[in-house]
A protein has these predicted regions:
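Conserved donor NDP-sugar-binding/catalytic core segment of glycosyltransferases
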Residues: 90-126
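A conserved acidic beta->alpha catalytic loop
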Residues: 21, 37-46, 62, 92
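A short, conserved alpha-helix in the catalytic core of glycosyltransferases
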Residues: 163-226
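Short, flexible, basic/aromatic active-site loop/helix in glycosyltransferases
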Residues: 131-170
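Active-site-adjacent helix/loop segment of glycosyltransferases
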Residues: 210-292
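Short aromatic/hydrophobic "clamp" motif used to bind/position activated sugar donors
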Residues: 82
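Glycine-rich, basic loop-to-helix element that forms the pyrophosphate-binding segment
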Residues: 59-77
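Short, acidic, metal-binding catalytic loop of nucleotide-sugar glycosyltransferases
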Residues: 20-30
Length: 294
């Protein structure tokens, strides 16, 4: 069985397209879909109950955040394979079947994602990432990565120097689509939880990828197939607030995994503060008021 876990937050407008794109049977396996709704008052629950009665709908008592809600959905799931999926995605059966077959026949793969394509046809760069070095982070914040996207010296953060249609191992993938075996998620879990609930919204996917890799598994991007990611529909659009939240969450991931010494903690705090301030300074110069895809 494949279990699909979706965390919804003010997702009434896009959840229908997401659920409508999901099969109930895939490669001979039954598919169960679980929606954990962090904002049950927006009407998404009524839509799901009326149009998708096969979906297991869980109304959260409050906004649990991304990681905690995913953990609740995971606990309710039964599948040998589990897909964590965003509500602002539109999937297709060939892409799902391809990724599932790759996972089924290669036990070294811990997590896999297809290419994620945005509404304008461009690639969602966050669907394949490195575990960035300090230099990679500076290049992205300072705009060098976007200015020289095909140069490996500057493009290490989002790996834009690699072919979009290729298949290769990466450092991290996006929480919008994370497919893995239950045995892998259980092996990478901390205190019985797949996602670290200290990360309310951002950084949790990076943290999980690091733990899966530490458990001895590969993180794979397969660009031969693609799904649509209507990025940002379920989150706030204020550039400053979101940028600060992303940088601060990723800083905390680095402190968790790489900040064993006082010197390392000082280094990462300083680096992430610099990256955040440089990125916000560039945004103000360009007059951004809405979130750019990253």
């Amino acid at each position: 069985m494949l279990s699909i876990v979706i965390v919804a937050y003010k997702s009434r407008d896009e959840i229908g397209a997401c659920l409508g794109s999901l099969p109930v049977l895939l490669m001979g396996r039954s598919v169960e879909t679980i929606v954990v709704d962090n904002s049950p008052g927006d009407g998404a629950g009524e839509l799901i109950r009326s149009e998708f009665p096969h979906v297991h709908y869980l109304a959260a008592p409050e906004n649990l955040g991304f990681g905690r809600a995913n953990n609740r959905g995971y606990s309710a799931s039964r599948g040998e394979y589990v897909l964590f999926l965003n509500p602002d995605t539109v999937s297709n059966e060939p892409a799902l079947a391809h990724c599932l077959s790759r996972l089924a026949y290669d036990e070294r793969i811990g997590l896999i994602t297809p290419k994620l394509v945005q509404a304008d046809g461009s690639m969602d760069l966050a669907c394949r990432r490195s575990i960035p070095t300090l230099w990679d982070g500076f290049c992205r914040a300072a705009g060098l990565a976007s200015r020289f996207p095909n140069d490996a010296r500057f493009a290490g953060y989002n790996l834009t120097h690699l072919p979009e249609g290729g298949t290769y191992e990466v450092g991290a993938i996006n929480g919008a689509f994370m497919l893995g075996r239950r045995s892998v998620f259980d092996a990478a879990a901390e205190n019985g939880a797949v996602f670290d609930e200290r990360f309310f919204m951002y950084g949790d996917d990076l943290d999980l990828c690091i733990r899966v890799a530490k458990a001895g598994y590969r993180i794979v991007y397969d660009g031969s197939v693609a799904i649509t990611h209507l990025k940002g529909l379920s989150v706030a659009k204020d550039y400053n607030a979101m940028s600060r939240a992303i940088f601060d969450a990723n800083r905390d991931v680095y402190l968790k995994h790489f900040g064993a010494s006082a010197l390392a903690r000082m280094k990462y705090r300083g680096a992430f503060a610099m990256w955040r301030n440089v990125a916000l300074w560039r945004a103000r110069l360009r007059g951004y008021r809405r979130v750019k895809p990253v």
